[in-house]
């Protein structure tokens, strides 16, 4: 839910990047001896996720607990997106996402080529939502308005992999990004590809949706 809204609104998702937030200098990125992948020269425990993948750093525009700055609608903030996906929190308000016996509440854009098994196994970098903000998203998110929104209840949103940048050793012995064209640039890298994950700098966490039920958002009511 990071595309430009079709109507003016104060609603800005927590995961949306803001003007003034800056990516960390790549001069802090280096290579482990023996061609064993990437690391930060001043690496800390939060720089890697639980699967050991290194994450892109980015400053945060905060005033107390409030995220400030004009939204960059088409971009997400790496650590805020990761936070919501890891903890399955609402991507707008960071509170508990909606969950019932049918599972967590996710939104997806309607597709013209939905596979035979429906949305089972769908990969998403969009964190779940609470019911209030799911309803706001289908009205305000330009991409969902144009394509049409599908409401999904998901029993098992499995950790799948990451979106980001693959690196290799450059001619000067320093990390060099591998360039990809088209959809390949945003294709998730599965965690199971352990030969590549040490060379990956992640910017979005991806889950695989299992136990999926398509529901009508208008029929959903707040949990008791």
Predicted segments with their positions:
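N-terminal alpha-helical interaction blocks
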Residues: 1-85, 153-224
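Short, flexible coil/linker segments at or flanking structured domains
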Residues: 78-81, 93, 117-118, 140
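Short metal-coordination and nucleic-acid-contact micro-motifs, chiefly zinc-binding Cys/His arrays
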Residues: 83-89, 123-126
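Short cysteine-rich clusters marking metal-coordination/redox-active sites
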Residues: 90-94, 130
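Conserved binding-pocket/active-site segment within a compact domain
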Residues: 103-194
């Amino acid at each position: 839910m990071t595309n430009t809204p079709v109507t003016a609104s104060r609603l800005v998702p927590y995961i949306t990047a803001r003007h003034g937030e800056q990516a960390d200098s790549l001069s802090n990125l280096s290579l482990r001896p023996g061609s064993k992948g990437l690391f930060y020269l001043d690496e800390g425990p939060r720089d890697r996720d639980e699967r050991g993948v290194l994450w892109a750093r980015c400053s945060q525009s905060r005033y107390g607990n409030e995220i400030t700055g004009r939204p960059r609608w088409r971009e997400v903030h790496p650590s805020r997106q990761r936070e919501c996906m890891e903890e399955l929190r609402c991507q707008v308000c960071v509170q508990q996402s909606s969950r019932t016996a049918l599972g967590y509440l996710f939104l997806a854009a309607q597709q013209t080529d939905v596979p035979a098994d429906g949305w089972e196994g769908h990969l998403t970098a969009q964190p779940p939502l609470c019911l209030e903000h799911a309803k706001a998203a289908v009205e305000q998110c330009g991409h969902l308005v144009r394509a049409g929104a599908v409401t999904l209840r998901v029993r098992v949103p499995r950790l799948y992999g990451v979106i980001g940048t693959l690196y290799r050793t450059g001619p000067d012995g320093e990390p060099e990004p591998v360039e990809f064209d088209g959809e390949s640039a945003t294709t998730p890298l599965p965690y199971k590809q352990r030969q590549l994950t040490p060379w990956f700098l992640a910017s979005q966490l991806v889950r695989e949706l299992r136990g999926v039920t398509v529901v009508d958002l208008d029929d959903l009511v707040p949990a008791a």
